[in-house]
Amino acid sequence: DVREPDEFAAYRIEGAKLIPMRTIPARLHEIDRKTDVVMICRSGARSHHAGQFLKQNGFERVYNLAGGVIAWAQDVERAAA
């Protein structure tokens, strides 16, 4: 999750790890290159850019949650209805 701490505190997806976008370069060592990495943000824009950065730095299994947590929450609400 590349959102800011206040955004993450307000709404989070279970199992997500908070690494704010601005801190990714210094925290690359915390991300496992051998597993799938799903990038998450509010709308999908920041996570897209962060995912591109990871790919440029040798990560191969990088995916973006299209539409971000906004779209994810809407999908969950529709499924629950």
Show where each model-derived region lies.
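Rhodanese-like catalytic fold shared by cysteine-dependent sulfurtransferases
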Residues: 5-38, 45-81
